[in-house]
Amino acid sequence: MRLGTVEHKKERKVIVLVKNDTFLDVAQAAAQAGMSDFDFSDMQRLIEQGENALEKISFLLDQGNENCFISSDEVVFCPPLIPLQYRAFSIFEEHLKNAFAQATKLSGIKYEIPPVWYEQPIYYKGNRLSFVGHQAEIKWPSFSEFLDLELEIAAIIGKKGRDIQEEDASDYIFGYSI
């Protein structure tokens, strides 16, 4: 199931891909189906409702209510969700080596990967409002001499947990985004 968030007629909507360039407006379809017990107004609310919400969306897709369909040429893609928090993990050694080499080149200070990086996951907290939608224009800050463009993959956590066993980890992932 491919979910997203779009702006359609000046309103943000959660959508699900029906086929190729056609999406289902999830909230509109739910309202027409009388599903007042679910809130599909934004992706975060959908995630917080868990597996039951996904089952309801599958049901709505099966209904195929065409008056709730939206064409891709009618929308502006938004970030799939605005996360409550954002942690970026540095997990690719080659990327980190390249980043440190660039930092060394620009600053004259020698940067090396610290030994702890090989022992435990290292992350930084990013700006949760820095995400953009598919095909969005990336703003180049006037004070910057170059852009560091990266393709990121996000694992979106769907339920709370602590000290989760490796074999159970996938049960806590709602989905992925690029």
Task: Please give the residue ranges for each predicted region.
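Low-complexity, small/basic-enriched stretches
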Residues: 1-37
